[in-house]
């Protein structure tokens, strides 16, 4: 339904939404005139609020004389009325500093990103690992532990590090293992699981075993990426008034633990879009209707995409949450780019 609001109605809606997001209370016409410095009478504002209510932008709680925004009103505000915001320079510097202080590995970055999103927005911070259309090998090492037992350490194009043990058909010294990895790395660099499995066919036993384990590790990583989610900041959300109802807090826990975001929602999103704000019924699943989700994609090389965002009640500071999500996505993308250093696979 396309509705043309007057400029005054737009301003009234904007002030009602922002006051409600700030206080959590219904907003009356008299208070709105005073706080928003509107140059009209409370009666005129009441009339416009009645029109906005009839158009489903505002609702009239039974326990209050004021109005609150509906889901439709919140969505209109975010799309048409909300002013773009940015994190302050001080916040941006502090966040970048935090990322330089942690271990320079993907899991540490993603856990920190979820934590920073939670602290900055006051909601649950969510981050998924980068998911490759096809995961590729970047580098691997073989480390001798005892006689025939070797530690295989590999790094993928998306920056994931994986370790596994393998038992060789015959013992090799560390010098021999290093020579083997130095010989194979240039041949295998940027190959996917299927290509490495083909290389294993007809290879001598030790090489075939190493190649098969590399292929298995890539398969494991691809599967793990589809089910992993970093979530931080639940304590921020459950302190909010909306979660005074125990069932809503329980529902949020079920959403996070049950994998609904990963298995149903994320595959339906377009990573080329910048920042998505999904409110209530936008999330389609009944379990997610009480919430809002703000998220965007970050990049790790040409073929890998991860998601990060915030999840919370529909009454949230949308402008600040969008600013936090946008900035964290740029920071994580920069870090992934530095780590990956891989070729542009799109270009061949």
Curated annotation (Swiss-Prot):
Q: Which PANTHER family match?
A: HEAT-INDUCIBLE TRANSCRIPTION REPRESSOR HRCA
List the Gene3D superfamilies hit by this protein, alphabetically: 3.30.450.40, Heat-inducible transcription repressor hrca homolog, domain 3, Winged helix-like DNA-binding domain superfamily/Winged helix DNA-binding domain
From which organism does this entry originate? Thermomicrobium roseum (strain ATCC 27502 / DSM 5159 / P-2)
UniProt lists the family membership as follows:
Belongs to the HrcA family.
Cross-referenced InterPro entries? GAF-like_dom_sf, HrcA, HrcA_C, WH-like_DNA-bd_sf, WH_DNA-bd_sf, WHTH_HrcA_DNA-bd, WHTH_transcript_rep_HrcA_IDD
What superkingdom heads the lineage?
Answer: Bacteria
Keywords tagged on the record: Repressor, Stress response, Transcription, Transcription regulation
Q: Which GO terms describe its biological process?
A: negative regulation of DNA-templated transcription
Q: Which HAMAP family match?
A: HrcA
Protein name, per record: Heat-inducible transcription repressor HrcA
Query: Which is one Pfam family of this protein?
Result: HrcA
A GO molecular function assigned to this protein is: DNA binding
Segments passing through the bilayer: none
Q: Which cysteine pairs are joined by S-S bonds?
A: none
- What gene does this protein come from? hrcA
Q: What does this protein do?
A: Negative regulator of class I heat shock genes (grpE-dnaK-dnaJ and groELS operons). Prevents heat-shock induction of these operons.
């Amino acid at each position: 339904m396309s509705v043309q609001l007057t400029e005054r109605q737009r301003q009234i809606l904007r002030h009602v939404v922002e006051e409600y997001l700030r206080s959590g209370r219904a907003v009356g016409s008299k208070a709105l005139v005073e706080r928003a410095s509107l140059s009209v009478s409370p009666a005129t504002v009441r009339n416009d609020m009645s029109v906005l209510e009839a158009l489903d932008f505002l609702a009239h709680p039974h326990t209050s004389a004021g109005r609150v925004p509906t889901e439709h009103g919140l969505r209109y505000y975010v799309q048409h009325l909300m002013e773009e915001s940015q994190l302050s320079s001080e916040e941006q510097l502090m966040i970048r500093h935090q990322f330089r202080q942690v271990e320079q590995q993907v899991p540490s970055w993603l856990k920190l990103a979820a934590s920073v999103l939670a602290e900055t927005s006051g909601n649950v911070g969510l981050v998924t690992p980068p998911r490759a259309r096809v995961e590729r090998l970047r580098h691997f090492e073989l480390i001798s532990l005892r006689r025939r037992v070797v530690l295989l350490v590999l790094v993928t194009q998306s920056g994931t590090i994986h370790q596994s043990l393998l038992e060789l058909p015959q013992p090799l010294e560390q010098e021999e293992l290093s020579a083997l990895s130095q010989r194979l790395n240039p041949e295998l660099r940027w190959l996917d699981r299927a290509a490495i499995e083909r290389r294993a066919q007809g290879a001598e036993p030790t090489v075939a075993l190493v190649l098969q384990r590399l292929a298995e590790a890539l398969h494991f990583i691809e599967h793990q990426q589809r089910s992993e989610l970093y979530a931080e900041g639940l304590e921020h959300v459950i302190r909010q008034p909306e979660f005074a109802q125990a069932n809503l807090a329980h529902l949020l826990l079920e959403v996070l633990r049950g994998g609904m975001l990963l298995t149903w929602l994320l595959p339906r999103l377009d990573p080329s879009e910048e920042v998505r704000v999904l409110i209530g019924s936008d999330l389609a699943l009944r379990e997610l209707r009480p919430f809002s989700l703000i998220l965007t994609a970050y990049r790790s090389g040409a073929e890998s995409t991860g998601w990060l965002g915030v999840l919370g009640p529909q009454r949230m500071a949308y402008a600040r949450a969008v600013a936090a999500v946008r900035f964290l996505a740029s920071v994580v993308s920069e870090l992934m780019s530095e780590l990956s250093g891989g070729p542009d696979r799109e270009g061949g």
